[in-house]
Amino acid sequence: MDSSNIRVIAFDADDTLWDCQGHFEVVMHHLYDELVPWVDRETAALELFSTERKNMRLLGYGVKAFTLSMLETAMRVSRNEMPAETINDILQRCYSLLEFPCTPLPEVELTLKALRDKIRNHTAPSTALTSLVCFTKGELLDQQHKLERSGLQHYFDYVEITSDKGEAEFRELCRKLDVRPEEMLMVGNSLKSDIAPALAVGCQAVYIPFHVTWQLEQHDHFEHQRMVQIDHFAQLLDIMNAHL
């Protein structure tokens, strides 16, 4: 990967800047427990995955889509026998996902601050990193609120929230930012949504795995000459050091 011409660094949000999937996993496992009178936990997990995948085209990503899939799975698998109070409990647990703390993951704020300072102090902006961007997918209000709860919003020059993240969305982001794809570096935890489409349109990428991956985001691992994998967030500064 060549960092010498990078003008924009775009960061994914969920499970890159803060933990998101971990909170969803807790709620999902509660559903599996509640469905034990009808099916084993493994079957319950498969049923939820099947429901989420079926609903993806119409509902997209986010808490609302997840909530509808959770309730649909609960009622279908239990053959509408699950008590109303249990259904309500599942609903309330899903609601809680709209307010969980978005505490920045280790080294995230330190790294963003260092990059922000370098941009502010650089004396050759025509050849230097000029912008930090948050590029995330999901429901507009939910993603906006999570960014606010994280306290990280002031580090970003621009925030783009989309319903999906594919090649078309990456091309559109480059157009809006007026950069060539090779001048943008995408940093994220999802090979499927962050890394593969960014590389496909010509961007560079830094892959930072998270300890848990949503089943619908899983992707076979691969290597690429324009991709670097890091183990912890501050390594991004090492990668950018020659450029900064």
Positions of the model-derived regions?
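Active-site neighborhood of HAD-like aspartate-dependent phosphohydrolases
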Residues: 1-47
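Asp-based, Mg2+/Mn2+-dependent phosphohydrolase catalytic module
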Residues: 1-9, 109, 113-118, 133, ...
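Short, surface-exposed acidic
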Residues: 36-51, 79-90, 155-158
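A metal-dependent, Asp-based hydrolase signature
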Residues: 51-96, 114
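A short mid-domain helix/strand-loop element embedded in enzyme catalytic domains
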Residues: 87-93, 104, 139-144
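Active-site periphery "cap/insert" segments of enzyme catalytic domains
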Residues: 97-114
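Intrinsically disordered, low-complexity terminal tails and inter-domain linkers enriched
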Residues: 117-130
